[in-house]
Amino acid sequence: VLCMGALYHLFSYEDRMNAMCECVRVCKKGGILAFAYLNKWGNFYNGMINNLKSMDLLYREFDSGNHEDIFFRTTAEEVNKMCQALNLTCLHNIGVDHLAFLSSERIDAMSDEEYAHLLDYQRKAAQEPNIAGASLHGLWIGQK
């Protein structure tokens, strides 16, 4: 069962849990679930570096998770806790894009060989729990 975006836009804990509960309900026993979410940490860095937002605004968005009443940001740890509360088994909780947002112009200018190296790095980095929160997007994959 894929939940690819609902957690981006539901601001209350109750609404996010309701969406996740519905995914669990329709998932067969032993089935696989995937929940996509936005990371607070990576989005903080992106806002500071690429969007040149004021630090006051960045701190308010970070603390609340609310970005312009459009997006909700969370952490890998918070998503893990929600999934544990639903008795789900975590298989992976990965960072999807990591720090690629810091160098989009550099990525666009890469040769095919350089880009292949970057993709190899991204695959390895996605599984590294120490840097998962630095990614803009997270993906929790688990089993019912």
Predicted feature residues:
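A conserved beta-strand element that flanks and buttresses the S-adenosyl-L-methionine
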Residues: L2
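Short conserved AdoMet
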Residues: F11, K28, K144
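Conserved catalytic-core motifs of eukaryotic protein kinase domains, centered on the activation segment
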Residues: F11-E14, N46
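A short glycine-rich, Lys/Arg-flanked "PGG" loop and its adjoining helix->strand segment in the class I
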Residues: M17-I32
